[in-house]
Amino acid sequence: MEQVKRVYTFGDGKAEGDATMRDLLGGKGANLAEMNKIGVPVPPGFTITTATCNDYYRVGQDAIVAELSDAVAAAIAKTEASMNSKFGDASNPLLVSVRSGARASMPGMMDTILNLGLNDEVAAGLSAKTGNPHFVYDSYRRFVQMYGDVVLGMKPENKEDIDPFEAIIEEVKAVRGIHLDKDLTVEELKDLVERFKAAIKKQTGHDFPTDPHEQLWGAICAVFRSWMNERAILYRKMESIPDEWGTAVNVQAMVFGNMGETSATGVCFSRDAGSGENLFNGEYLVNAQGEDVVAGIRTPQQITKIGSQRWAERAGISEEERAAKFPSMEEAMPEIYKELDSLQHKLEQHYRDMQDMEFTVQEGKLWFLQTRNGKRTGTAMVKIAMDLLHEGLIDEKTAIERCEPNKLDELLHPVFNKRALAGAKEITRGLPASPGAACGQIVFHADDAEEWHAAGKKVVMVRIETSPEDLAGMAAAEGILTARGGMTSHAAVVARGMGKCCVSGAGGIIVDYKERTVKIEGLTLKEGDFISLNGTTGCVYAGEIPTEAAELSGDFAELMDLCAKYSRLQVRTNADTPQDALVAAKFGAVGIGLCRTEHMFFEPEKIVAMREMILSETAEGREKALEKILPYQKADFLGIFRAMDGKPVNVRLLDPPLHEFVPHDQAGQEEMAKAMGVTVEYIRQRVNSLVEANPMLGHRGCRLGNTYPEITAMQTRAILGAAVELKKEGLDPHPEIMVPLTGILYEFESQEKVIRDTAAKLFAEEGVSVDFKVGTMIEIPRAALTADRIATRAEYFSFGTNDLTQMTFGYSRDDIASFLPVYLEKKILKVDPFQVLDQKGVGQLIRMAVEKGRSVRPELKCGICGEHGGEPSSVKFCHRVGLDYVSCSPFRVPIARLAAAQAAVEEVK
């Protein structure tokens, strides 16, 4: 392999990297280097690059280890010099941590090992040097536990079992009658080390390595391997993080939070990650190591006094008891707190964003182990962006870029109905780890959560604590409840990042995985029982509580105003009812981009008349039935035009094949026979005659209108009749009539003539006319290829990207699920093309159609109305190819508006 620099060192206020090198050094490595340079105390160490991770998978472990060995040895020597100790030396040992660090934050998804370098001789030497054997053997048993899990694969044998190491610890504590790990004696800790080693040998067949250099290479390679573990792959898929980015490996001198009562470890945030409030907050544990906080093994205490008081109030603990038993760091370690507060402020000012920081206090000295832009809820994301804008730390364009479009979805999630909540039975309280309202059936294991979710059930996952292996279950659940863990535990951090409701550290619950029960204050709930969680307050309720729409904040409105200021691309909505139209208008939709007329026919009184029209064999019979349908259609359009007064409403003429409307069951056919005064056999024969081998490519869209022009005429009268009536009332309707599934100019011309002839007749009858446009959906590849011809008649194009994707790929939307998972797994496809617009294929047809159409009609309006209209990357593509608008479901409107603004900001850059 070509010799490239693979190892970058940092320490003593110097670093070979900086914050701009996150692609190469990963987020953690780049920030460790940057913190060194700006005077934040960071233990020395080195970073192995993300490119090395990719080469690890390309050329194999042996080749990478051989190439890295000299550079790693030199970096270890540099770290030894900084710490005045020696790696593997029994009398003056250097211990290190080995951590992952991708360029995008992936909390808990990859592996970490602490206290590396310990063996029996080093432990004895370190005990003699420090005079603190309890700290040494506590660190040693932690190291064996982590290494056994991460490197040697020591896992629970089945999902009902707890961690095998924890099982041994619990057994030892039970014999002694103690509850906390820190109460274990030195002899018990030594015994745990030996029992852990024996358990590893028995379960894995591997001896625990005693050579520190062998330990180091085992850990480095394990971190590289963890890039491709199941949970990391799933997380990358959820967060759209490319596999080819790879992870860096950070090797850093250990500092110890478990050296006694003047030592501690913690995680803190420069602002509240749940609400966005400008309030420094976090959690710490005295005499502990960092993984204790993140893993949720012990429920920690608050860093700030105000945070501690809020926690005590929620937990029902008096101020006197709180101050005595659960003091904040601000009270218990005031000097350390003052330094921590000063440095967190410095880091936020430097990075100009909310920071998530990890730190350790070793015998009264503060060290920072990492900083990163913190994961946050959708609510916090918007508030923090607006607050930083007001504080002058960022400008308007940066505020727009700081917000992730898909996370706006969280702000629109329902909350518990206030009246129902007032009468609900609260059964316990925990920490409000991630806001929102969640209700579902209890499950205890991640695979069960996935299975129940796939069966259409809503579930709440209840765990003692979550681990990264639970990620898929957390994604499937409505919410998460844990017995252990704080506001910075794995469950809390991941839930906030996913926008999932979470209540953590509910100490009043007892979870029994084998019995599949949870006992809460004397109440026993079983798997399948309903439970409700309020992640904003930490309250847990028995049973189901109904929800209602959330109220949107002033910060949200301000962000939407910024989006309007910078966007060129407009956002409409897909809406078939006045209610949907009003919701979308509230979110800022400038019109309706797709109103589907067929959805209006499925109400009981309408479907009979519709079926009568379809099942009639003569034009006279169809027209008679259409006369019954006309007032229903007109009434529907009156409501929608009224809701969208002054805004364009694009109505698609009847599109689906007729067989979708007719009764296929015996009872339905008997009902129609009675209504039409014909035999059941006649109805059955007519229904059978409508069945097609490939209905999506059959008698539908404009083909229906051209074979049954009376349908188009009726719909035109309903649309324009409603517009005329509202104009007489003084309103300002803007109807647009869209011909679906056009592939040939003559198909469109034929339908346009019916529409315009019907309009002229209607306007003459009413003595009033309204302006309207006639356009077409571009959803057949031939229409895109001949768009210049179609644009000679069509006044606008609306790209139906669902069907255009279907016909371009030759994939059936209804059947793609049979092979899509395999295609995604094998990377034949990177994403589902029905979810994310295929820019290289379908996108080029759109680009071509826009260019061809505007070559003959420069003022041609173009938009899209498929599901892609609310997907951020697709919206940005639509901006780049010059579309005028996108249209999406009402609750995706804010997401599309933000994506459109970001596209405009990115274009200027």
Model-derived regions: residue spans:
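Nucleotide/phosphate-binding sheet-loop regions of phosphoryl- and nucleotidyl-transfer enzymes
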Residues: 1-424, 451, 457-460, 467-472, ...
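Structural motif
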Residues: 250, 443, 460-463, 481, ...
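Long, charged amphipathic helices and adjacent flexible linkers at domain junctions
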Residues: 238, 400-452, 458-459, 527, ...
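A short, small-residue-rich loop immediately preceding and capping a beta-strand
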Residues: 478-484, 502, 863
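Short, ordered loop/turn segments at secondary-structure junctions
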Residues: 47, 51, 466, 485-487, ...
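C-terminal accessory/binding modules appended to enzymatic or scaffolding proteins
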Residues: 17-22, 434-476, 842-859
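Conserved alpha/beta-domain cores
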Residues: 99-100, 552, 562-909
